[in-house]
Design a protein with these regions (language model features):
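Active-site catalytic motif of lipid deacylating hydrolases and related acyltransferases
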Residues: 1-10
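Active-site acidic short loop of glycosyltransferases
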Residues: 11-12, 85
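Short, contiguous strand/loop micro-motifs
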Residues: 12-13, 91
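Structural motif
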Residues: 13-15, 36
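Gly/Ala-rich beta-loop-alpha elbow adjacent to hydrolase catalytic centers
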Residues: 17-22, 26
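Aromatic pocket-lining residues of Rossmann-like dinucleotide-binding sites
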Residues: 29-33
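The alpha/beta-hydrolase serine catalytic core
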Residues: 36-139
């Protein structure tokens, strides 16, 4: 809801950037608001079994604990939106140990794609691609 308010209040075109599950949310918001998005090793939720994630988890960055419920799984499934090809740039590394890059490549077929050998889920080449991401966003 907070991101939606920021998008709605922006006085200029917004380009979203999301990785992992944030890539799923970026896709959802890009379709909702007609925006462009850069998706970095995104979760292609359509291919995932949400039941595998139900339970307690710890945020890797903050250490915060949270519980992923059946209601969350239903909510995620309802947010799956087929991508509009001209709006997305998929950045994936084949060495992603968390998500299968082929699922994202299939889901975003027809979209601009950069799929690189090696790497991992953190997208090890982020700094290398930052200038191109900013250019894609018109910044």
């Amino acid at each position: 809801a907070d991101v939606s308010r920021l998008i709605e209040a922006a006085g200029w075109p917004v380009t979203l950037v999301g990785s992992s599950l944030g890539g799923h949310y970026a896709n959802h918001l890009a379709e909702k608001y007609g925006l462009n998005a850069v998706l970095i090793n995104p979760a292609a939720v359509r291919y995932l079994d949400p039941a595998l994630f139900i339970g307690d988890h710890v945020n890797f960055h903050s250490g915060e604990r949270f519980t992923f419920t059946v209601a969350h799984a239903v909510q995620l499934a309802a947010q799956v939106s087929p991508p509009t090809p001209g709006r997305y740039w998929l950045l994936s590394e084949m060495g992603d140990e968390v998500l299968d890059w082929r699922q994202a490549a299939e889901f975003y077929a027809g979209c601009r794609q950069t799929v690189l050998p090696g790497g991992d889920h953190s997208f090890t080449r982020f700094a290398e691609f930052m200038p191109q991401i900013l250019e894609y966003a018109g910044l």
